[in-house]
């Protein structure tokens, strides 16, 4: 199985065809619905964020899981997806984890149906 690199333009189509591949990605992957609820949270993201993936499914990403991201550019890009169903943006982001600032690259990419958006996270 080929490795899917971070930032791959058609990653949404690959994961739509083969959803199980999200678990083998070498970077974090979170699937959010248009309201920001978590539908999928892979193991790599669990390691980056220090969370058990099974405990976050169905929870509000911006209010319960990553409130530090609310009100920032990252959240603003998600709100555009909420309104339009479209997203494909990469940005640099820093979050505080256990008292240390962690730099990551974020790729927000909507699924073709416009109902879900992938949030890919890679340590910078």
Curated annotation (Swiss-Prot):
Organism: Rhodobacter capsulatus (strain ATCC BAA-309 / NBRC 16581 / SB1003)
Domain annotation PAS: ranges: 22-85
Job of this protein: This photoactive protein is a photoreceptor with kinetics similar to that of rhodopsin.
Chain positions found as S-(4-hydroxycinnamyl)cysteine: 68
Keyword field: Chromophore, Photoreceptor protein, Receptor, Sensory transduction
NCBIfam families: photo_yellow (TIGR02373)
Pfam family, one: PAS
GO molecular function, one term: photoreceptor activity
Superkingdom of source: Bacteria
UniProt xrefs under SUPFAM superfamilies: PYP-like sensor domain (PAS domain)
Family listed: Belongs to the photoactive yellow protein family.
Protein's gene: pyp
Post-translational modification: The 4-hydroxycinnamic acid (p-coumaric acid) chromophore is covalently bound via a thioester linkage.
Gene3D superfamilies: PAS domain (3.30.450.20)
GO biological process, one term: phototransduction
Protein name per the record: Photoactive yellow protein
């Amino acid at each position: 199985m080929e490795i899917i690199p971070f930032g791959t333009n058609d990653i949404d189509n690959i994961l739509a065809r083969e959803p199980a591949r999200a678990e083998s990605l070498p970077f974090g992957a979170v699937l959010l619905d248009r309201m920001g609820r978590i539908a999928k949270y892979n193991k790599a993201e669990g390691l980056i964020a220090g969370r058990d993936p099974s405990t976050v499914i169905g929870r509000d990403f911006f209010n319960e899981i990553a409130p530090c991201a609310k009100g920032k550019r990252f959240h603003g890009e998600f709100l555009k997806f909420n309104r339009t169903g479209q997203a494909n943006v990469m940005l640099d982001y820093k979050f505080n984890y256990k008292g240390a600032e962690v730099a990551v690259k974020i790729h927000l990419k909507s699924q073709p149906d416009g109902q879900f958006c992938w949030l890919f996270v890679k340590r910078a």
